[in-house]
Regions:
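A short beta-loop-alpha structural element at the N-terminal edge
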Residues: 1-16
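Conserved GNAT-fold acetyl-CoA-binding loop/helix
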Residues: 16-42
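Conserved beta-hairpin
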Residues: 49-62
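Conserved GNAT-family N-acetyltransferase fold
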Residues: 52, 64, 69, 74, ...
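A short, internal acetyl-CoA/4′-phosphopantetheine-binding micro-motif in the GNAT/acyltransferase core
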Residues: 70-81, 105
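Conserved catalytic-core motifs of GNAT/GCN5-like acyltransferases
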Residues: 103-105, 121-137
Length: 143
């Protein structure tokens, strides 16, 4: 399965996947916080990133958002967790798009470990996320 370029026409499927993934993997977020972030992802996150997705039997299984050399987002639908789709998308971003940077929620150790396993290292930490919420962000780089 190769990543394909996603467009604005794919946003409904992308945001549905985003929400399912966040609900399954971001247990530190309250439901109202997910409601706070969702319109921000739609308004700023998706349009400001180059999006690529992997489909399985015509279903969007995962996607990655890239801006410059930074991975802005990588989300996998819970039905496809543990099947290597995240690794495929990450390798595509690193090898084909020359990505070397990513931010990850400190409260999401599974994601942090995923990036460490793929060679990323911590270079800085912020106490709050980009929207000022008290969710620490780890800034990682590929060495």
């Amino acid at each position: 399965m190769l990543p394909v370029k996603l467009t604005e026409a794919n946003y409904p499927a992308v945001i549905e996947l985003w929400e399912a993934s966040v609900r399954a993997s971001h247990d530190f977020l309250k439901p109202e916080e997910i409601g706070f972030y969702k319109p921000l992802v739609l308004k700023y996150g998706l349009p400001q990133s180059d999006l690529y997705g992997i489909y399985s039997n015509s279903v969007l299984a995962g996607y990655i958002g890239i801006r410059g050399q930074k991975i802005e987002m990588l989300f996998i639908h819970p039905d496809f967790f543990g099947q290597g789709i995240g690794s495929q998308l990450l390798q595509f971003a690193v090898k084909q798009q020359n990505c070397t940077l990513v931010d990850v929620n400190e409260e999401n150790p599974r994601a942090h470990e995923f990036y460490l396993k793929h060679g990323f290292k911590l270079y800085s930490r912020d106490e709050k996320d980009d929207s000022g919420q008290p969710h620490p962000i780890l800034h990682l780089t590929l060495l």
